[in-house]
Amino acid sequence: MIKQPKGELTIQVVAMPADTNPSGYVFGGWLLSQMDIAGGVFCRKVVKGPVVTVAIDSTTFKCPVFVGDTLCCYVSLIKIGKTSITVHIEAWVNREFEEESNIKVTEGKYTYVKVDEDRRPVVIEK
């Protein structure tokens, strides 16, 4: 059975040498940052306004990311609250020259809050 990503493809970015640690693996912080960006892009579209990250509720690292991997972040809606929106984010890599070329590397649950121009929480209209 071929595993498929769940959610909307929100961003794609190639991992570069500057994103790695001395062992040659991409930093977990870089990966979290890309996932956070993807979640923010998705949530801004859903709530029709700016959002800020308030929680990374969970993250599971499944396997490493290497230089040259194309990181693809998929986002799906979990729930919308009064001022917050919670999403599930899956990070997959595309390794073009390997037999298993589409690999889930990380997933997590992120929560964002819609804010106004003064950066205060505002009600999300449903």
Residue ranges and their predicted role:
Residues I2-A55, V113-K126:
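Hot-dog-fold acyl-thioester-processing enzymes
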Residues K3-L9, F66-V67, I78-K126:
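HotDog/MaoC-like acyl-thioester-processing domains
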Residues I56-S58, E107:
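Extracellular/lumenal ectodomain signal focusing on beta-strand-rich modules
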